[in-house]
Amino acid sequence: MLCNTDKAHNAELEYLDMLNRHIVDGVITGVHSLDVEEYKKIKKPIVAFDRYLGEDIPVVTVDHKEGGRLAAEILLKNGCKKIVHFRGATAVESPYHERHFEFARIMKEQGVECFDYELAWNKFDLEYYKYAVKDLFDRLDEWEFDGIFGTDLVAIECMNEVIRRHKKVPKDVK
């Protein structure tokens, strides 16, 4: 079964319960609101998208390191010197950290100044991104950044906020 919780907090537990009761033969999960220990208790087929859930649970992921490198190269190529770096929650063990490690490594190597903004764990809705972007922009009011590195929805909300603040994309901020 491919799982989607649609923000229902108990849905993930219900899927695991269905697996334990043999209603389904296996679970492919991209939702990760439960503690990893809940997954470790289950000795049935589980595959995870982009999060480590235990030694015996395979993870399907993308080449995050390459993604971080490509993002760094494009921002450097476009002359960015001060970059806002939106990153996922560091408390969660996930392959996506490789993207951020690689991006930060390259930027440091090139002498580019970065401001890291850690996003909350398991928050993927537009309202949260609007809040996070506004919070960041309010905190960095005097810091003139020229580049942004983040997920698609974060980048879109950043573009909206840049425009609201009477700056131009991509002229002033990339």
Model-predicted regions and their roles:
Residues 1-34:
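Central regulatory/effector-binding core of bacterial HTH transcription factors
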Residues 33-43:
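Active-site-adjacent beta->alpha loops and helix N-cap segments on the catalytic face
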Residues 10-23, 41-48, 53-174:
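Bacterial carbohydrate/catabolite-sensing allosteric modules
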